[in-house]
Amino acid sequence: MKILILSCDTGEGHNSAGKAIKEAAEHKGHSVTMIDMFLLSGKGTSHAVSGAYIGIVKHIPFFFGLLYKVGMLISSDKRKSPVYFANALLCKKLSAYIESNNFDAVVTPHLYPAETLSCMKRKNLLHIPAVAVGTDYTCIPFWEETNMDYYVIPHDDLTDEFAKRGIPENKLLPLGIPVRQSFCTRTAKAAARTRLHLPSDVPIFLVMSGSMGFGKLAVFAAELAIRCHNNEHIVIICGNNTKIKRILQNEFKFNKRVHVIGYTNQVSLFMDACDVIYTKPGGLTSTEALVKNIPIVHTAPIPGCEAANVAFFKKRHLSVSSKRLSKQIELGKIMIENKELNAEMIRAQRRERKPYAAIQIVGLLEELTHTDTTD
């Protein structure tokens, strides 16, 4: 089977979901191509889309929250939004790309390509199965104006929310958010720490801010370091934000208990090595930590879908969170000291996690294309 995965460079979460599906499909012998859809219109378009999104999220997050609220108000299955028509402009280019490469199925972990694919279906330009994958624990605006063959959603409890927004319930498959195989297995904590050159006999906090380095990370890290009185170590992964990385490295250059990391492909191993993770409530990072069974403290969300992610996790005792920085730090220390609370969260995570989403999505594509997987 020849699979096309369409994503967009608006943060690493969507790309991580796509890479998880790609990994699972290639493991089963399928041919997979994963691209940023907007590159079909040129690098300028791709950079403009990603630059605008990331710029708003990093520098004026309250405006992103406002846009999200407006989107929720105008989003409807009865009419098409400006977002739909903007993405529809790529119909012909995407149709030509799919036909020229003879793909058997297409899957997207991002709304924008789903809009384009839906327009193609309306114009009879799409003749292969198309599957969308939700990467947040809520139905974000404009999903209901798409028309995919199936929608993979993060959890069974979200079925009603998606259905009430206008997506046919028979198209909703609560398989989970796909994560790479490395997050579905565990390296022993001692072994992980040895490989990462971290101490074996002290508590370790892992602080993650996402690939964009979102949030008041420098302030948070400084306060956490001050509050660590029991020789705890802190590992800070600050994403692609090289400015924050430089600031933190300068701030903690004389503090051997603070380890500042930029973007890394060893997140899974760092999770294995830590005792508690502080993370912004992005759908992917939260799911990776959930699948890993690590006590989670959610930090300040990007207004919009991340606030919904926090609410979903807190309701099911999968994480703890607070809007106040000092309380967030306190909660992390409590999760280390209170073994009963720690164990309760781990039990809840084991009950709710869905580690096989990527494999099941590949199985769905095989069914839709009638691919024979027998030897």
What are these regions (language model features)?
Residues 20-95:
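Conserved N-terminal ligand/cofactor-binding loop architecture of enzyme catalytic domains
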Residues 12, 69-166, 171-174:
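Active-site and donor-binding regions of nucleotide-sugar-utilizing enzymes
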Residues 272-282:
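Acidic donor-binding loop of glycosyltransferase active sites
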Residues 354-375:
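C-terminal alpha-helical cap of glycosyltransferases
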Residues 149-204, 208-211:
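A nucleotide-sugar donor-handling region in carbohydrate enzymes
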Residues 314-340:
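C-terminal "capping" alpha-helix adjacent to the active site of nucleotide-linked donor transferases
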Residues 341-355:
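A short, well-ordered alpha-helix in the C-terminal region of glycosyltransferases
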Residues 199-274:
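Donor-nucleotide binding loops and adjacent catalytic segments primarily
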